[in-house]
Amino acid sequence: YGSVGNEHMVSTFFAVLIYFLLLLSGRFIWAWLVKRRHTLFSGIHFAAGCIVWCAFLAFLFGQGFSDRYISDYLKKNIYVTQAGEVAGFADYCAKGAYTPVCLTYGPDGGTDMTTGTVDLSPYVAKEKKWHRIYRSFFTKHTRKDAPIAGKIWFPKEAENCPVVFMAHGNHSITAESYRGYDYLGEYLASHGYVFVSVDENILNERSGENDARAVLLLENIGEILEKNGDESQPVYSKIDEDNIALMGHSRGGEMIADAYLFNEYDAYPSNGMFTFDYHYRIRALIAVAPSVSQYLPAGHETELSDVDYLVLQGANDQDISVFLGNEQYENVSFSKDGSYIASSLYIAGANHGQFNTEWGEYDIGRPFSLWLNVKNFITAEDQQEILKIASLVFLDKSLKGKDTYADFLTDYAKYEEYLPETLYVQQYETSDALFITDYEEDSDLETAPCGSVSAEHFTMWTEEELADSESAMGKRENHAVRLKWKDTKAAYYEIALDEPMAMGEGGICFDAMDLREKAENEPMDFSVVLTDIHGNRAVSTLCDSTILYPAFPVKLSKLQYITGKNE
């Protein structure tokens, strides 16, 4: 809390200082133009006042400041052996061989397919009268007759295709948010997928509605699958109903996890008097810059099991400025009965809105957006390209069983030359993983589930709960060991196994973070030594295979460039 308070004090000081300078310079301009005090000193004051106001307006209405840390960090990659070309991947990522076809559906006419409505009143609170009037004016509907509507992309030449249902998040009710993923629908349709972008605008500009969003998504799935079985419909036989993926952005990214739960349940967790009967064959979830815990089923966090899960987050997200998707990622668990993966990708320079072409580069509305820094973003085209490639690889593995490039989800660096140039941080977990330790068992530093732990020559050795950032008020309910040292050669941390552990072909993986905050730091390096029961040793040095970046010094507002504070 102290860090947040100090940052608030610094920001307040600069805000007061700017206000004082503008007030003073405004008086100088007023004296010259209105009072007509045309003396030498008044002229100097007038010129100074004009400079101050021009600088302020340029600061306010400009895009802000550029960052150097991305290019500086990328230069550190010279320490890492660069991966060569991956055969066929460039062609794989290009537009596919199928011809995309686009249709619309909805209950109000003027669409290619006519659908119905759904009563969402059990899942969303009644609004005040003027809110209801406002909502019905723009949507022509109420919570009691929410439209089942959206847009469908599918491959013209193919049938029995896997299907992806996409849900947008909260935005202005006047924007057609569901149209913002046309680029993704066209791309995936060309690769043999049906892509349905669901219109949930009826629930925008309100709170406490994520459970209603989930029900609306599931009702859309039911309606589209019904059309899939109707010979008179243009989507007849296009969809493989055994291969369904859910995809969501922002609140939609959180909601797809709730929808997955509701699909498994027979009753609404918040009121069991309302029943469910969905049970669609949902195999995979893709969350894009998701929120978290806006809806808690029966007061619990949304925990998922035995489903493939992919989450992407931009480091420059000015709406969800903390990687909240990490919390849901860590609430995905696997049994040993199948083959599943959870993977996450953190993208430097990506914001919240550029994943949706209707939302754009400003993640907050006027007038607050005037303070946002947007000059340090990657382009919208690059941001969307990252989502397209990651989604295709993930869906091909999960829904089509294609593993050719599936290691993209565990080793993006192998494919880095095919991705837009920026920084990426990846983590993953597979269902066949065996954990040596995850630091969740107790507070004893010298124990691990599989054996014992020892450490020497560190200035700090502790286990602690992770936070998403220094200023984050919440915790991630995930623990790690924290080590700090000065003598690189002498310091060591050792885990000794009680019993031999059979190793698969995947090797040993470590999740690690560099907690240093200065971009000018040289890449962190340490060695991992593996000793077997016969005394044979294998040594791997970190910098020989990868680079562990320091924390990204992200600045979301223009004022942070003046105060020098990072997120």
Residue ranges and their predicted role:
Residues 176-196:
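Short amphipathic alpha-helix adjacent to the substrate-entry channel of hydrolases
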Residues 160-169:
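Short beta-strand element of the alpha/beta-hydrolase
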Residues 253-265:
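Short glycine-enriched nucleophile-adjacent loop
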Residues 485-566:
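Extracellular ligand-binding interfaces
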Residues 157-159, 208-250:
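Gly/Ser-rich "nucleophile elbow"/oxyanion-hole loop immediately N-terminal to the catalytic nucleophile
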Residues 303-380:
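Active-site-adjacent alpha-helix of alpha/beta-hydrolase-fold enzymes
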Residues 1-67, 349-352, 358-495, 503-509:
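Alpha/beta-hydrolase-fold serine-hydrolase catalytic core, especially in secreted/extracellular enzymes
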Residues 3-14, 18-159:
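Short conserved active-site loop signatures built around small residues
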